[in-house]
Amino acid sequence: MKIADKDEFEKQNVFGTGTPNTAYAKYFIGESYLNPLTKPEDGLHLLNVTFEPGCRNNWHIHHAKSGGGQLLICTAGEGWYQEEGKEPVSLTPGKVIVIPAEVKHWHGAKQDSWFSHIATEMPGEECSNEWCEPVTDEEYNKLG
């Protein structure tokens, strides 16, 4: 369900919006927020990531010698996920996306909806992230 109103979104966003994502703001167009659900030292770091309408992260790649990748679990609002060279996937609550290592991709909110997902990096060897170019307005506006 698309949710343009922030107050209404807060009622649906069961894991909470969290605080402004200042640490990674340079890799996002628009405002995003982070609410850590676990700590990195817990063994599995889960974050609830919230995107304001129109917000998306840059293209990026989760590298790993073996294993690795990322898992997204959509929790509120509506968003997009897209792998390079493939059609975008509409994200709604309950949708799970498994992103293998070495796949260039991006994710974020639809133009007219707040959006949240839980994100975690999959276990692997020699894991790292590479942030790439922004998703252009031209690319994004084609999504509808």
Functional labels for PLM-detected ranges:
Residues 85-102:
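Short acidic-glycine-tyrosine-enriched beta hairpin
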Residues 98, 112-131:
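A short hydrophobic beta-strand segment most commonly corresponding to one strand
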Residues 1-45, 128-144:
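A short, N-terminal "cap"/entry segment at the start of jelly-roll beta-barrel domains
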